[in-house]
Amino acid sequence: MSSRTNISCLQEAKRVAIFGGTHGNEMSGIVLANMWIQNATEIERKGLVCKPFITNPRAVEKCTRYIDTDLNRAFTPENLSASELEALPYEVQRAKEINQMFGPKGGSDAYDVIFDLHNTTSNMGSTLILESSTDLFNLQMVHYIKKAMAPHTCSVLLNEHPQLKYSTTRSVAKHPVGLEVGPQPQGVLRSNVFESMRTILKHALDFIELFNNGVEFPPCTVNVFRVQERMDYPRDTNGNITAMVHPHLQDCDWEPLNRGDPMFLTFDGRTILYEGANTVYPTFINEAAYYEKQQAFVTTCREILAANAIRKAFK
């Protein structure tokens, strides 16, 4: 079979949105989106509509994660089809509005690409989040971004877990991409984190412009971390946390956690070891926003995904 046979011809990406403020205290995306709303020169690309947008303005105004419920979990079929006559939480109302503007989710008229900009208090560095292992466009794009960012690291988190995958703000698009850059405290703007996010978006938009101009991207492989399990803190019978992330694990996102390694440190000084059968790679370690979600960290496994060559489909 010739290499030409393996080229996947994909539709041009004509409409791109950049979402900031899905969580109203994650400042890098908020500032970038507002900056580009005022002056979009930096994100303009020939033949491409690129719309910066603040998704949760009330939460941004109050510098809080959300008002009533997490917007980044609100894009379920039930919420998007809820009657306007119902007394809906603010973020559910907002999800319906965003779906009308940038969707409909799963529809042919949805935006081609949505970049949803997030910060984490965890030591994750620059991370791209994907929701599908078969989206050739996104796989080729993150491969391009990772090469452009070198020698700086840009990790790729893949969440296809049937129980742990959630209905994200970006899932409205045909090609949803999350950006998670940290560590950065909530409500704080750090220049290095801000510039990393800005650089990732530049490379992403460059890729889309090249693709739309007919550039063919050869087959590639992408190293990803696949979400496996959510780990909670140890708790007592009343549900109260009884231990902290162990100092040997703290700030060690993406590093191997082996059986027998320290995982938690109880308040009375006892070390709790990891007892899993296989080595895992934790991330979102001690994320501040996830205490309410009963999550100390997420375990992942390493995987290599292969993507066919792609080019724009010519009419």
Swiss-Prot record:
Co-factor binding details: Binds 1 zinc ion per subunit.
Residue numbers binding Zn(2+): 23, 26, 118
Sorted UniProt keywords: Cytoplasm, Hydrolase, Metal-binding, Nucleus, Zinc
Pfam family membership, one: AstE_AspA_hybrid
InterPro entries associated with the record: AspA/AstE_fam, Aspartoacylase, AstE_AspA_cat, Aste_AspA_hybrid_dom
Family: Belongs to the AspA/AstE family. Aspartoacylase subfamily.
Residues binding substrate, per UniProt: 65, 72-73, 166-170, 180, 290
GO CC term (a single one): nucleus
GO MF entry, a single one: aspartoacylase activity
Coiled-coil zones: none
EC number of this enzyme: 3.5.1.15
PANTHER family from the UniProt entry: ASPARTOACYLASE
Listed Gene3D superfamilies: 2.20.25.160, Zn peptidases
Location(s) in or outside the cell: Cytoplasm; Nucleus
Stored NCBIfam families: PRK02259.1
Active site: 180
Protein name: Aspartoacylase
Main location: cytoplasm
Reaction(s) catalysed by this chain's protein: an N-acyl-L-aspartate + H2O = a carboxylate + L-aspartate
Function, in words: Catalyzes the deacetylation of N-acetylaspartic acid (NAA) to produce acetate and L-aspartate.
Recorded superkingdom: Eukaryota
Entry cofactors: Zn(2+)
